[in-house]
Amino acid sequence: FDAIRLTFQEFFMRLGTDPKRWGVPLAALLGALYAQIGLGLGAIGGKDSMSGTFEHIDVPPTLISFALAPERASSLITNVFTETGAKVYRLPVPKDANFIPDFKAYAALCRRVRENIRSGNIAFATVAENGGTAAAVVKSCLGNGLGFAFAAGDLFTECYGDLLVSLKDASAFPEAVYVGETAKSGFTCGKVTVSFDEAENAFENTLAKVFTNAAAAEGNVPDCDFAAKAKTVHVGAKAAKPRVFIPAFPGTNCELDTARKFRLAGAEPEILVVKNRSAADIEESVEAIAKAIARANIVAFPGGFSGGDEPDGSGKFIATTFRNPRIADELQKLLQVRDGLALGICNGFQALVKLGLVPYGEIRPLVAESPTLTYNNIARHVSRLVNIRVASVKSPWLSACKVGDVFSVPVSHGEGKFVAPADALESLRKNGQVATQYCDLSGRPTMQYPFNPNGSMWAIEGITSPDGRVLGKMGHTERTGENLYKNCPPVLDMHLFESGVKYFK
């Protein structure tokens, strides 16, 4: 608690010369200052927004505070429910006789909560906001498909700042108010019952007309399972610590995650920042990239938004750079002469497709019939965990997997829909180049949103080159590891990076 620091962001109407309008942000800031002094917490930054007035329309006066505090990841807990039978209590904000928060007592309460989190007495915690206790509980149930049995009580009274926690031993908090316990499905309070679907639809559909949260399923998904084993023996000199070249273009944002996963797998990653501010910078970067590829065993194209996904399409900046003859020659030598590997994730996958490295295994000019990745069916960015099913283990990257294995991976993209002509899709299937597919909770490849987050044809999430040594996939396998996604069921590791490194040993 004592390490918390605040930032502020405001959005108010145009103030002009009206003293009353000036009083609105002043009152908000005085209130924020009063709370800061009471809690002994300082604000270290803020953002001043533009005018919130258009003609005669004003935005609702708003002051938002973001609270941040450093903590060991292993000590963090979830703010959503993950199992049934969890008993939930509300810890009210201590208040004085005038119903003003007693900040000193509230700070002491927060410190006690932290101690109980560390001791294991509290496994879940969240804060009541708009809608009171009921809204906070329901939102914490929806993510993992759980319900809740409410005890009789005042569920909708505003109780800003009250803490909702699961307690194994409620005697640690004599002031705790029992709220109820998690259930398999549905929400009940006395004789009132609301189904899970009703609650979920009410929560998700409020802004559905503005932010589409559904897309019609298009097409069928044939059986793409391919039984051939992966090529696991490297032709060439072995490497105790294979070298991995990771180019970081303007807009790339996953190079550090990718390097970390390779380092943990026993490789030696090298990140090279591509500079393009001047002609001299570009020439220098081209030479540096070519030399880095020449000393590498693996080239890994990380995710991000290279070049801001311009001009008119993702991955084009990377593809254009790697079509430079000096770079292209070294990359072809790596793949065709030195038996190297290449990997592209998300934006990197888009670059591999635009280069032709998947599905063709070589850099080649693209034609109208070439496979590509285009805009998601819901016409906006998606960011969520999805399940993928392994359809082929032809690639060395998937040597630790079996056909039919299912893994959870995070996706975050606006252009992830894989499309290709029918004959190209059939060729991928026959050659075992369909590596992974989006699947439902039963492990069946599907076109249904949100299991298939972008509408990819044949539910394709990842494909390989004909020999399997180049793999492109949309899911961010590099964003997995210990102490991540604590609000979700376990995210199983594909051992993708370990398999790529093992190929050279």
What is each of the regions a protein language model found here?
Residues 1, 124-140, 251-255, 348, ...:
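Conserved phosphate/anionic-ligand binding catalytic regions in large, soluble enzymes, centered on
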Residues 191-345, 349-360, 368, 374-383, ...:
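N-terminal beta1-alpha1 cap of cysteine-dependent amidohydrolase-like domains
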